[in-house]
Amino acid sequence: MEIKDIERSIIKKYRKEIWSPFIKALKEFELINDGDKVAVAISGGKDSLLLAKVIEELHRHSKVDFDVEYICMDPGYTEENRDRLEQNLSYLHIPGKIFETEIFQIAEEVTKGEYPCYMCARMRRGALYSKAQELGCNKIALGHHMNDVIETIMLNVLYAGKYNTMMPKLKAKNFENMELIRPFYYIREEDIIKWRDYSKLSALDCACKVTKSEEAYTRKMIKQMIADMKKDNPGVEISILRSAHNVNCDMVVGYQQNGEKHTFLEEFNG
């Protein structure tokens, strides 16, 4: 497929499913502003590859004056996966800057191979922040989509006993003046898959052998649970997402703010 057709499809064929919700998130959450330099983090998966193309289109046509870099971290890919990453960058005409780390190996050694996903994610995030800062960027864009957000909400409620969501943007704790943004906050995974298939793209899944062996079991359970609920309630995904926008602190027993715990008794006893 011609690259011009792939690029055009983002704004034309998939305007309703991809471009419009992307623009909605940018405006609603003020994700990209004049003077920003955004590092698009590309793992080689479908989400980050589409994110790179969408932000590329924005950079070409938007009135917002910002700069962009495309960074690709190799956390220890096999030769086959590294080759596929490079092929996808070439196929999509993405000028990605690849840099190497040993994160897969370190995460597996530290956790002794038992569910290293959290450790791996934190290390990858730190490496991306460092590279972005080195390139003079003030923001990192990640490809987390709407389904990632709602699955995170449900994981926290059902497995951690707390209400935490995946925020559309965050300030970095350990990297001064750096922010993380999630422009795909309103985009469904099924629509990203449609674009991937239309574009005839062979994207990477998580290339970690430990994750493959454990199959990210808990998150897959949550994904299946939501799919089952959707059969009876087609709007369940939107309802879960909206719950993070409609928390009524007058109707919760306890909550935290700035690391400090509060209870309803503070107001009740006035």
Across the structure, where does each feature detected by a protein language model lie?
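Short, low-complexity, intrinsically disordered N-terminal peptides in bacterial proteins
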Residues: 1-5, 267-270
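Electropositive phosphate-/nucleotide-binding environments in soluble metabolic enzymes
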Residues: 12, 16, 49, 79, ...
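The feature marks non-catalytic terminal segments
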Residues: 201-270
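Short, basic, helix/turn surface patches
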Residues: 121-133, 169-175, 226-243
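Catalytic subdomain that performs nucleotidyl-dependent activation
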Residues: 67, 148-221, 225-228
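ATP-dependent adenylation/nucleotidyltransferase module used to activate substrates
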Residues: 2-155, 159-162, 167, 190-198
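A general structural signal for short secondary-structure boundary/capping elements
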Residues: 116-121, 142-144, 185-189, 230-232, ...
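Short, solvent-exposed coil/turn elements at secondary-structure transition points
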Residues: 74-76, 102-104, 172, 186, ...
